Regions:
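The canonical Cys-X-X-Cys-His
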Residues: 139-151
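Extracytoplasmic c-type cytochrome modules immediately beyond a signal peptide or single-pass transmembrane anchor
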Residues: 25-138
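Bacterial N-terminal signal peptides that target proteins for export
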Residues: 1-9
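Short Cys/His-rich "knuckle" micro-motifs
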Residues: 154
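Sec/Tat signal peptide C-region and signal peptidase I cleavage site
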Residues: 19-25
């Protein structure tokens, strides 16, 4: 009888450990989603509101436009695959699960965003609307390439 008791105790401990691991991974996924969402918002706001409005002509070019470009470039330089870990496709996320198995395409898309944002700051510093527009479009296109492939529609 004591043998069965040990088996039941071990099974119970295993079940508790599994529950704890699953709970931790859900929390880790949620934290990863929140970090990704925060990073994208902190990068998107200065791009679309700070520079995009200058491109559209609804806001005048100024020193804050350069700060916006520097912010976008600084944040883009930190992008890597750790923003997209398996399990971060929580209910609030619009990420497609295909991203978790697409390492090479994700790396290429991240490299394209980084490359585009490196060109953004010098273009914005010129103050030339055509140069700013071209650089802005290149960055927006690079960002949208990833969103188109790996983000669900709203």
């Amino acid at each position: 009888m004591q043998g069965w008791h040990q088996v039941l105790v071990i099974a119970g401990i295993s079940a508790l450990c599994t529950t704890t691991v699953d709970g931790a991974s859900t929390e880790d996924g949620k934290a990863a989603f929140e970090r990704r969402e925060d990073t994208m918002k902190r990068m998107g706001r200065p791009l679309y509101l700070g520079i995009g409005r200058v491109v559209k002509g609804t806001v005048a070019y100024g020193p804050e436009t350069v700060v916006a470009a520097e912010t976008v470039a600084a944040l883009a330089s930190t992008l890597d695959r750790t923003l997209f870990p398996p399990g971060s496709d929580v209910a609030e996320s619009r990420i497609k699960p295909e991203i978790f198995t697409a390492a090479d395409p994700v790396d290429q898309l991240i490299a394209a965003v980084k490359s585009a944002t490196v060109q953004l700051v010098p273009a914005v510093k010129t103050g030339d609307k055509a140069a700013i527009t071209a650089a802005y479009d290149t960055v927006a296109d690079a960002c949208n390439a990833c969103h188109t492939r790996f983000r669900k529609e709203e």
